[in-house]
Amino acid sequence: NSAYEYQKTDEFRCMRISHEPSIWVGDRGTWQFMVNTSKDYNTNDDYGLGTLKANFSHDNEVAKAHYYKVSFDGNGGDAANSQIELTPTSHGAVVRFTYNNTANKSVIFDCANGGSRTEYSGNTFKTYSDHTGNGSKRMYIYGEFSETPKGTKINDRKSIASFNSNRVTMKEEFGA
């Protein structure tokens, strides 16, 4: 018996990384990111993952143990005309974001259930997640983009990075 349930809705909210997933005591050290084509770093709108969603179909995804890909079509909501590809590594992931000539080419980071603060420097970023319980430690995240963002904005525990290119790769590593 497992608590896992195949997603029944057509809403895709984000990719979530968990330091230690558990159906018994809950995830600890979670951190989320999402491709976005509706917001730019200059926006004054709320851009937290709780306010964003992308329409998707399981017909537009490839899900394997070593590779995940989902494409959002022109009706894809906040991620219209974009795609995420993810390959896990031993302590991180390599992610590619593809944008189909949209005006806004952004990635949004959020730590919805804990403390976090993202710092950008050139094409790198570092952040942490304080979403912990049972005395667990903070999870640290370090990432590197294939290009320097054209602009970033940080707001409490969420941030946005916007790009010029139609394809951006992000390498990230995390640990306690």
Residue spans for each PLM region:
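Accessory carbohydrate-recognition regions in carbohydrate-active enzymes
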Residues: N1-A176
